[in-house]
Amino acid sequence: MMEPPLSKRNPPALRLADLATAQAQQLQNMTGFPVLVGPPAHSQRRAVAMHLHPRDLGTDPGVASTALGPEHMAQASGQGPCPPSQGLPGLFQVPAPAARSVASGTHPGARTHPDGGGSSGAQASAPPPPAPPLPPSQSSSPPPPPPPPPALSGYTATNSGGGSSSGKGHSRDFVLRRDLSATAPAAAMHGAPLGGEQRSGSSSPQHPTPPPHPAGMFISASGTYAGRDGGGSALFPALHDSPGAPGGHPLNGQMRLGLAAAAAAAAELYGRAEPPFAPRSGDAHYGAVAAAAAAALHGYGAVNLNLNLAAAAAAAAAAGPGPHLQHHAPPPAPPPAPAPHPHHPHLPGAAGAFLRYMRQPIKRELICKWLDPEELAGPPASADSGVKPCSKTFGTMHELVNHVTVEHVGGPEQSSHVCFWEDCPREGKPFKAKYKLINHIRVHTGEKPFPCPFPGCGKVFARSENLKIHKRTHTGEKPFKCEFDGCDRKFANSSDRKKHSHVHTSDKPYYCKIRGCDKSYTHPSSLRKHMKIHCKSPPPSPGALGYSSVGTPVGDPLSPVLDPTRSRSSTLSPQVTNLNEWYVCQASGAPSHLHTPSSNGTTSESEDEEMYGNPEVMRTIH
């Protein structure tokens, strides 16, 4: 009597066309909880019939023995029969014939409440009555699966799809744990997937899926409950799982947590006892879990990191490694922390100590070595005994310059402008103007207040004239044209033009002063190349010579004052009498003082530029 209504009520339930069409839209609501969701009975039974086919029940008894579907219990459909040790504890096992009878018969006790909230415990615990198996063509609408076990009673259901919505309208059905923080360590000890379900495509025979735990949390990381190829839009596209790479780490609930990874990496770098995202509590077990999570993060990148929280928590648990960790080697241990340097404190719990140290300015002790002119003008006996300098120390260059300018150089009342810096080569010779003395003092203090304004250059200069000449290298300006007719050569500074003029006048003011050598040249670079032939041994390194092996730049003027410590007397012939006579400027007609800048205060501005712009001269004055 019941056969016509059933066949009339759901005639196309087992047609091949419907089954083929239903594969494109896999079930998205949680079919393992028939009492927690509220779709109509006929749509619910049709969805179960599409998912739990009698042929599938015969080959995979693990599907019928679990309250949740295979996509929610982290069990892939292609893994074969589930061993008894990997089933849910507390659930009864149904053999294959009984499973077929369950699929074909109707459960009279499985009723849903009108509000779709749940069912009574007596109705949920009643086993289905045995029934003879029917062929697939004669089977009626299958009943819903068995009710959930009592271990899942701590979950609450949220149905936002409505009572009349289909499977695609339940993409927002989630199962949430009430107290996750209290049960997360316990779930991690049993290898429960803490972040989501295991996708079927990421499983492999070498890495079987771990068994679920009753107290676990089974929430899809992508926001849907369809399979890998299932339809339906993801609720959270940013957390959608990407297919696992070959040979990758099969993780439960793969989620890209770049921020957490960066925080854990910073905690490991700065030696924090726990990651920054951990609560500041005295829970010893949570500290161990956090430390294991930081260790598991070692070796992974900070961007698009697949974080396996379950493996990290299980590594820190007191129990042995779970089934999932038995197939993987333990994560590599972090490298040993370097020994604390006295200038770089890396103390546990002080993550910002290094950054605070780097923000501090570099402390320097700048000592004023200005001598007292009154003591120098005293009797010779007191002067010979040694005049003590000022010896005041300053932390910044600005303080030192202000001290020398105000207290030693003086104001307009000073009539003589003499440098009394210790070991100054001028030996008390005055300057004509105060600004010249101030520019000269920068040679002793090292002040360079004129930086290059071009980005990326980074050069600084002691005088504004030197900066003006340097900027021509960026702009390409060459305002000094050769004065001889027929020559179109242009130069960035006047000194280079003067050196070039010797080519037209046939003057050779640079000659070799070694005995027996009467060579002379029009340019100092040619003389420097010539001096290499007087070396009996191979030429030493450029640093030992004081200039490059091919000669110093053309723009550098030559000075007769050379540092004795930078000479190469050991490599020259014994015929050399005076090393300072290597580079001598011959006077042709009028006295030429361009290449031997004097320090008597009568030099022109161009000569002053060369003197202060030449780094070699600055080194010799020191």
Swiss-Prot record:
<feature type="zinc finger region" description="C2H2-type 3">
    <location>
        <begin position="480"/>
        <end position="504"/>
    </location>
</feature>
<dbReference type="Pfam" id="PF00096">
    <property type="entry name" value="zf-C2H2"/>
</dbReference>
<feature type="region of interest" description="Disordered">
    <location>
        <begin position="232"/>
        <end position="251"/>
    </location>
</feature>
<dbReference type="GO" id="GO:0003677">
    <property type="term" value="F:DNA binding"/>
</dbReference>
<keyword id="KW-0539">Nucleus</keyword>
<comment type="function">
    <text>Essential for neural crest development, converting cells from an epidermal fate to a neural crest cell fate. Binds to DNA.</text>
</comment>
<dbReference type="GO" id="GO:0001843">
    <property type="term" value="P:neural tube closure"/>
</dbReference>
<keyword id="KW-0677">Repeat</keyword>
<dbReference type="GO" id="GO:0006357">
    <property type="term" value="P:regulation of transcription by RNA polymerase II"/>
</dbReference>
<feature type="region of interest" description="Disordered">
    <location>
        <begin position="590"/>
        <end position="622"/>
    </location>
</feature>
<feature type="modified residue" description="Phosphoserine">
    <location>
        <position position="537"/>
    </location>
</feature>
<dbReference type="GO" id="GO:0008270">
    <property type="term" value="F:zinc ion binding"/>
</dbReference>
<dbReference type="InterPro" id="IPR013087">
    <property type="entry name" value="Znf_C2H2_type"/>
</dbReference>
<dbReference type="GO" id="GO:0005634">
    <property type="term" value="C:nucleus"/>
</dbReference>
<feature type="modified residue" description="Phosphoserine">
    <location>
        <position position="559"/>
    </location>
</feature>
<dbReference type="InterPro" id="IPR036236">
    <property type="entry name" value="Znf_C2H2_sf"/>
</dbReference>
<dbReference type="Pfam" id="PF18366">
    <property type="entry name" value="zf_ZIC"/>
</dbReference>
<dbReference type="GO" id="GO:0014033">
    <property type="term" value="P:neural crest cell differentiation"/>
</dbReference>
<feature type="region of interest" description="Disordered">
    <location>
        <begin position="321"/>
        <end position="349"/>
    </location>
</feature>
<feature type="zinc finger region" description="C2H2-type 2">
    <location>
        <begin position="450"/>
        <end position="474"/>
    </location>
</feature>
<keyword id="KW-0862">Zinc</keyword>
<dbReference type="InterPro" id="IPR043359">
    <property type="entry name" value="GLI-like"/>
</dbReference>
<dbReference type="InterPro" id="IPR056436">
    <property type="entry name" value="Znf-C2H2_ZIC1-5/GLI1-3-like"/>
</dbReference>
<protein>
    <recommendedName>
        <fullName>Zinc finger protein ZIC 5</fullName>
    </recommendedName>
</protein>
<keyword id="KW-0597">Phosphoprotein</keyword>
<keyword id="KW-0217">Developmental protein</keyword>
<dbReference type="GO" id="GO:0030900">
    <property type="term" value="P:forebrain development"/>
</dbReference>
<feature type="zinc finger region" description="C2H2-type 4">
    <location>
        <begin position="510"/>
        <end position="534"/>
    </location>
</feature>
<comment type="similarity">
    <text>Belongs to the GLI C2H2-type zinc-finger protein family.</text>
</comment>
<feature type="modified residue" description="Phosphoserine">
    <location>
        <position position="541"/>
    </location>
</feature>
<feature type="region of interest" description="Disordered">
    <location>
        <begin position="50"/>
        <end position="171"/>
    </location>
</feature>
<dbReference type="GO" id="GO:0003700">
    <property type="term" value="F:DNA-binding transcription factor activity"/>
</dbReference>
<feature type="compositionally biased region" description="Pro residues">
    <location>
        <begin position="329"/>
        <end position="340"/>
    </location>
</feature>
<keyword id="KW-0479">Metal-binding</keyword>
<dbReference type="GO" id="GO:0000977">
    <property type="term" value="F:RNA polymerase II transcription regulatory region sequence-specific DNA binding"/>
</dbReference>
<keyword id="KW-0238">DNA-binding</keyword>
<feature type="compositionally biased region" description="Pro residues">
    <location>
        <begin position="126"/>
        <end position="151"/>
    </location>
</feature>
<dbReference type="Pfam" id="PF23561">
    <property type="entry name" value="zf-C2H2_15"/>
</dbReference>
<feature type="zinc finger region" description="C2H2-type 1; degenerate">
    <location>
        <begin position="422"/>
        <end position="444"/>
    </location>
</feature>
<feature type="region of interest" description="Disordered">
    <location>
        <begin position="190"/>
        <end position="223"/>
    </location>
</feature>
<keyword id="KW-0863">Zinc-finger</keyword>
<dbReference type="InterPro" id="IPR041643">
    <property type="entry name" value="Znf_ZIC"/>
</dbReference>
